[in-house]
């Protein structure tokens, strides 16, 4: 049985070189699909590249590179988790991409 995936988990996904931050909510993730953003180690001045630091995660979440990933057909492993305050900042940045005003 596969692990339950939570918003804020960092995954290593088969055939994807960068770690992926799960940004979708837990109820959505129960489908076996997740929406996530890659975490790159290169610094950037973009307001949509948000730095995250935790025990084993150090990089920049690229909020504009949202991807729908089907974990039912890909191997994956949870390799970390980011703090709630970072999850809030990242989901706010993503929501800001779609705001009307």
Residue ranges and their predicted role:
Residues 1-101:
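Conserved functional hotspots at enzyme active or ligand-binding sites that engage polyanionic ligands
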